[in-house]
């Protein structure tokens, strides 16, 4: 996990805008406050042909005098796991960050702070591992040292302004604590979502909390991930897990660079906790909603909630299958898109982005690929035998 920092001075500011993108996933912080609410920015594109940048108004985050802009950079789809078997380095082997902060002063002058070799860098922050669908490994006691310097690199693609709906956090679900027949502790959030977990506990330094995520319990009422995993002698994926090593005292954690499909969370820890200490956060595109449903049964409402929480940057798919969020998302697209158009006024923006991916991802012959954005070594047919990665049919 790359950690970048730029310390700069500013005064008499009228407005400030931050332009940022990455080959990978980024999260920016100014003076201790998160920049924007876009989750897993800049989103997924075919990085060889199209990279989208975001623009943030950061005027209120800055102060007269010294300021610090810090950025965490993860592999994301660019270098992280893609496809049912978690293939790596599909678009490149070196994550990259591009940023430009424009400060407009009250006298009309403009000050620019841009990524260059003067930025501080280190890879010793609290997040030790972060992969799309496999999860995160976190050492809460770690603090980035920023003892190194950033390396200047390039990418042969001109960034374009983001034309899509940002992915943001939405519903927060409460947990119900249950004990399986074998005595394991599982949290039931009552609804299958795409998202991640958050918790706040008091612990001693070195204590561990391991979380594993899945959509269902098996026929015996036990936690299982067999319905979503592909397994061989060398690899089992997706892991859908978080391994958190505590610091002394209060520990607050929320997943940063991974997303899971789940309703149930297996908790393995010696840290004392209550179900109220945990929450599940649904993550999907921040579209303007026009449709709601009141129904006499929980089943009817769940039928609406399921597709409502699916869209993330492209058309619907499920995160644990972990394709590169393909624009032609197959069965999920055909099943849910017509419903989503009635629920969300801005659903057409996702379809516009899908068409853009199909266009930029065309073959040299001019024909569209089956599942854009398609990386170098992976081309998965958007036809599924069942809603399970373990039973996926490849072309």
Residue spans for each PLM region:
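Generic alpha-helical structural context detector
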Residues: 339-342, 356, 360
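Aromatic- and glycine-enriched pocket-lining scaffold segments that form the walls
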Residues: 330
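Short, small-residue-enriched loops and turns at beta-alpha junctions
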Residues: 327
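Well-ordered alpha-helical scaffold segments within catalytic/enzyme domains
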Residues: 336-347, 382, 386-395
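Extracellular/oxidizing-compartment recognition motifs
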Residues: 1-324, 333, 349-358, 364-382, ...
């Amino acid at each position: 996990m790359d950690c970048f920092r730029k310390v700069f001075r500013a005064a008499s500011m009228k407005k400030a805008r931050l332009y940022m993108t990455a080959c990978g996933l980024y999260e920016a912080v100014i003076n201790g406050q998160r920049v924007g609410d876009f989750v897993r920015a800049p989103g997924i594109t075919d990085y060889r042909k199209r990279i989208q940048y975001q623009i943030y108004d950061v005027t209120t985050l800055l102060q007269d005098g010294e300021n610090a802009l810090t950025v965490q950079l993860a592999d994301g789809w660019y270098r992280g796991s893609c496809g049912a078997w978690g293939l790596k380095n599909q678009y490149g082997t070196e994550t990259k960050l591009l940023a430009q902060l424009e400060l407009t002063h009250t006298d009309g002058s403009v000050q620019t702070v841009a990524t260059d070799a003067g930025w501080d860098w280190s890879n010793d922050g609290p997040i030790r591992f972060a992969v799309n669908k496999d999860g995160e490994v976190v050492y809460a006691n770690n603090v980035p040292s920023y003892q190194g310097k950033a390396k200047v690199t390039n990418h042969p693609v001109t960034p374009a302004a983001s034309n899509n709906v940002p992915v943001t956090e939405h519903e927060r679900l409460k947990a119900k604590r249950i004990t399986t027949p074998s005595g394991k502790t599982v949290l039931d959030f009552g609804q299958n979502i795409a998202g991640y977990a958050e918790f706040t506990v008091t612990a001693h330094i070195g204590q561990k909390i391991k979380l594993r995520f899945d959509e269902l319990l098996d026929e015996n009422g036990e936690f299982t991930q067999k319905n979503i995993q592909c397994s061989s002698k060398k690899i089992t994926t997706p892991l859908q897990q978080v391994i958190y090593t505590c610091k002394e005292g209060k520990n607050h954690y929320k997943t940063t660079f991974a997303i899971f499909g789940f309703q149930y969370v297996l908790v393995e820890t010696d840290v004392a906790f209550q179900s109220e200490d945990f929450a599940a956060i649904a993550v999907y595109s921040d579209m303007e909603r026009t449709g709601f449903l009141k129904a006499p049964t929980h089943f009817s409402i769940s039928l609406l909630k399921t597709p409502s929480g699916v869209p993330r940057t492209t058309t619907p798919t499920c995160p644990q299958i972990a394709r590169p969020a393909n624009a032609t998302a197959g069965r999920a697209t055909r099943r849910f898109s017509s419903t989503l158009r009635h629920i969300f006024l801005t659903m057409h923006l996702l379809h516009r982005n899908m068409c853009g991916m199909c266009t930029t991802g065309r073959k040299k012959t001019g024909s569209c690929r089956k599942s854009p954005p398609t990386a170098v070594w992976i081309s998965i047919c958007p036809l599924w035998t069942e809603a399970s990665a373990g039973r996926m049919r490849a072309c």
